[in-house]
């Protein structure tokens, strides 16, 4: 047990005491990082199921010395390297932005207050914490009073009061008040060390695209080994092919089943979006939050700092009793704000207006709470002064307050009571007397109206959730061009059941407690919405944590920045549309080009099934060997799955995201995959009956496979633009340039289309083009 420090002699540790503790390892070095480590990045890009299966296939090809067919593995290595480089670049940018945003802990050492990083704290350090700060280590209160939000640790939204000698847990946040505290545990000894890691880092986000691809990979991963064995035995034993040919043909089928291209492109696109947003001063703390943004159809806004500038100013002070004129009111407010530890924007505005000589010494105080909507202070020679929302402190409505609210102002009442201040059970006294009204203005953010209109035009639903009076919020919303400004509710007057019932239809929620903010988000999510929440205060933390995606302003409380998915470093609400649409660009473009990649997965699976089935028929001449070799697939991929889709992912595409990504992509790819299967069966049967050589059959199939792939690229390039046409020309010319080059033909085991195969190619492609147009039109109608 640490000996409790004498609070009357708070000098902090000396430098020699600090060094002693550092030598003993009593340092708070257990820190959660919002950034992935370099090793995690390497591991994520190298040690994957895709790479493991590809590596196994490469080993088999190397064993039979099929060196030319190992080109695919060079592409796999390059893809892994590219993924590592891109992630490292994104990590560097995130780390750099996080460094600029890093919060310091005010620490007392040798009687001087200094700012330290959380990991520099040692056991017994004395730290100063204020509202909005996250507690970096378990600490005992030496001086002061605070209300602590322990929701990150316990899941309970109720605030916990902390007084002298109380223990505060790391990972929790100060919702109100200010304290001096002594570090009680450091590093891994902290009670909440693991929970702190979870609270400080961003909540994991499920990527629907990656989840779909994982399902596909899981399926192929289960069948690839038995399929591989069956195909190898078929070629080697039943067909009597040499070991090398058997391994090469079997490997091609297995490689084709792996949807590695689309997985790589998804990660690359998301990381590119992280970098692009970083250049726009938007800190993305979780890569997959970009995808979640794309699916957002309900954006919940905290009024202060988003629609408004968050720059409060006291407009008027209106005395409500003849016993206290403006001068008397000013003395009370000056004393109140001089003693108050409240640092929210409203308190700062009042403090700026009423600064001067203190007339009343403080006996005790109760910080402002976003749950109560008021704070209080017992002043010597005066009584207990209350400052907060009129409807929370007064029984009767004040007409002047209503008028100010309708002007869009924030209204506070200054009230007085002769009852003692009760910290343990804060409640409104029975003898409370209203002294004055304070009208506080918060200017509307420039461009907010255009931003709201634009979001609405893009099918993004909007809700305003605020702790302010709903009449004030409605008035501000009207000035900001919010269409549903008349749809509002006072949440202080309804219970949870009523709030749940109104959450979907109501547009503006006023006098919302932190618990109610969270409940609104939960209700919207249960209704099927993908939610995003913007905020900047400690009272927003529960809702931000609950939302599918959280967006906060850099000027907001440190606590919100630490748990947010995205941080607007410019603190500009007008950046929100661009962030949403960057996510849409990535997801829509991936969904748009996914069929190009899935064609190979489908036809490889179908052909493998047909090959295995043909072996069961019992006649050697009917046995079908997988018709392609890895080098052929790799070469076609460079011009079909490689450059064109990569370029297309950068195009702007802000339409709402479609659901059922994998199902729709598979259906769009199916006609082309069936064309490939038909081509193989027809050319094998017809070519054999015509006495074609294996090279002629292989050449025709190579051109048909590439051409069917190019049709999908053409569909992805519709409607045509100059840039897209040039992209198509480059791909086709590149393909022909390699296919007609003699040395490459030798590697590919093909030749040139002959007088026999060229007419068949032309006729089949004519039929395929007609079928492709018809199926594409049918899919568009659906």
Predicted regions and their residues:
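Cytosolic catalytic regions of P-type ion-transporting ATPases
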Residues: 2, 102-211, 494-507
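Actuator/coupling domain of P-type ATPases
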Residues: 7-12, 16, 21-33, 78-81, ...
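Transmembrane helix-loop-helix hairpins at the membrane interface
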Residues: 27-104, 350
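Helix-interface capping motifs at the ends of transmembrane segments in multi-pass membrane proteins
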Residues: 52-74, 222-259, 271-272, 276-281, ...
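Hydrophobic alpha-helical transmembrane segments
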Residues: 68-102, 109, 206-301, 455-458, ...
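Conserved beta-strand/loop elements of the cytosolic catalytic core of P-type E1-E2 ATPases, chiefly
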Residues: 82, 112, 184-187, 200, ...
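Membrane-embedded transport module
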Residues: 231, 342, 484-532, 547, ...
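Cytosolic catalytic regions of ATP/NTP-dependent phosphoryl-transfer enzymes
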Residues: 295-433, 440, 453-454, 462-474, ...
